[in-house]
């Protein structure tokens, strides 16, 4: 019984760790793109909030 309970746990953990490694390799690229887009979006939003009179036509 102990081995039967242990084996699926080991397999599932190995599967999860494999997914984490794959995600870890992809995350830096996504973070870099998102941070660049977020900064651009953040600056636009800040400009709208900081200078509403200039944006109102």
From Swiss-Prot:
Query: What keywords sit in the KW lines?
Result: Host cytoplasm, Host nucleus
Locate the region Disordered: 1-35
A GO CC annotation given for this chain: host cell nucleus
User: Where is the protein localized?
Assistant: Host nucleus; Host cytoplasm, Host cytosol
Q: Which Pfam families match?
A: PB1-F2
Source organism superkingdom: Viruses
Acyltransferase found in the keyword field: no
Q: Does the keyword ATP-binding apply?
A: no
- Bias (Polar residues) occurs at 1-17
Q: Which residues fall in a compositionally biased region of kind Basic and acidic residues? A: 18-34
What InterPro entries does the record point to? Flu_proapoptotic_PB1-F2
UniProt record similarity statement: Belongs to the influenza viruses PB1-F2 family.
As a miscellaneous remark, the entry gives:
Is not encoded in all strains, and seems to be dispensable for replication.
Q: What does this protein do?
A: May play an important role in promoting lung pathology in both primary viral infection and secondary bacterial infection.
Record's protein name: Protein PB1-F2
